[in-house]
């Protein structure tokens, strides 16, 4: 305000000065004119005064008119200049005012912390974090665009702050929703991955079980072929019905029972076996093994508790895996029921035997009779259940269960015990029916073979011996058949015999042989003994010959894969090495030539080549025109899977090459049944350091020999 007032005072002073000067000028002009006129005309003084006053009045009026004209011009100029000033400066003024408002709002809205951060502690390194930033250029731009000043007030800033915080809350909420959705998605993916892994693991377990199942069948076939039968092999043979002419005549569950064979029958049986061996002239090994397996089955003396537990595990495995047909499932389910029953009875008998041997009282629970089943009623129960088919037993079970549910059964405990016995009788009836069906199929197959051109010849002596002894043993055990087939734990007579045997003498009981037995001629017995020895020697020779004539086990692919894994991936400069560099050695006669058939070992070799950048090559070659490659090392993998003496590792030797001094021969020697093998390699000095790649090991039937050549550096 002071500057504007001072300017106005200066302008008014200048205007007054100009007016005074103009008035003084007019007076001087009038004075000169009067003086001139007085000289010329010389009017009277009064008239001159009047004229002077009128002229002064006229000049004053004209000067006032001139001054008014000049003042009007100055006012119009001032008005136009003030108009120009408002157009230029209003924007600057408004922007400054808006900036002041924004600064005032920022100062008023200043806080101590922003989102938990302060000026002293924040991860951004900003010491003015709590102060609101005023963007002056943006405010000027907004004012130019016509934004009202109310938008820069404290109220507007608070409103914008609320909108920003609302948007921040929305962003936080969306972020939390995305995090929850991401966590849920990751959980679902992890669940899917676990399900996939569980399914893969289940498939692996299933494949592993199938593999073990196949291996168990292979082992069973080997034991059957070699005459080392186990109970599970007999049960599998009952179900499968092998292609040979041998088949089991007894029911499958008879593997659990104890056979009683007299000593005389056993001796007669041994003599008959010897005669069959002589008749076969030790040529038909399959007949001998077949006879031995039949002997093992006919003279089976029952299973121990440990054998039954092992048999139960085998049956359980077959029940889980051998489910190709409903008949197989029924067969193994019935066998598991019979096995559980027999295992429980065997454990019961063992407990009684242990108590009897120790002189202790048997446990009360073992001596107690089954509730509702008196010993005198056992025969009636056996008579009720024996001889019925599986369907009849199922119908009887349904009838008893309906009576128990309706309450019409008079003796509930008795019928419950009968139901318990029904399970084992149903299982045995099912096994009988399946076995009968297998026998019918076998007979049908025999009839077809007899009608065909390729009839299978069976040794008549073998058939006669087996049939006669089976009939004799069956006649002997006919009286004990009911006891053997009955599910009753221990018969009273058997217990009495065992008690008498334990309490009395342990001398063998005198057994009378059959009247048809003949005396043994010493000469004939000696001949038979020599014949048996010849059979054993012939078997050994035949087995050795088959082993030598047989082809090596098909493990070459696996050995090659192992060698490739040991050598690693092929690098630049590696190449397959062997067939062209193999040296044909002179034929040799080894000391083991008469025992084993010599064979050449398989191999899988590599040669490593590369560039040697010495001073000469660096001078005359570059990477675009490289020097010729040179051999830098070898990797030998010689396969000896069938080595007789696996303890003694194969060796290698370096020999001179008569054709060239730049090459030499490396010979590999292992022993029977492999011949020596040699290769022609570059004659250079080797690196024997393991850090430089040297390796010489013999493991898992593979001889690994890896080496590189030394690199000689030029030194002054």
UniProtKB/Swiss-Prot annotation:
The keyword Nucleus applies. Plays a role in pre-mRNA splicing by facilitating excision of a subset of introns. Required for embryogenesis. Disruption phenotype: Embryo lethality when homozygous. Residues 153-201 form a coiled coil. Residues 1-104, 466-525 are annotated as: Disordered. It comes from Arabidopsis thaliana (Mouse-ear cress). One of its GO terms (biological process) is embryo development ending in seed dormancy. Residues 468-500 have a biased composition (Acidic residues). Residues 25-45 have a biased composition (Low complexity). The modification Phosphoserine is found at residue 450. Keywords: Coiled coil, mRNA processing, mRNA splicing, Nucleus, Phosphoprotein, Spliceosome. Belongs to the CACTIN family. InterPro entries: Cactin_C, Cactin_central. It comes from the Eukaryota. This is Splicing factor Cactin. Residues 10-22, 81-95 have a biased composition (Basic and acidic residues). Interacts with At5g63440. One of its GO terms (cellular component) is spliceosomal complex. SMART domains: CactinC_cactus (SM01050). Residues 46-61 have a biased composition (Basic residues). Pfam families: Cactin_mid (PF10312), CactinC_cactus (PF09732).
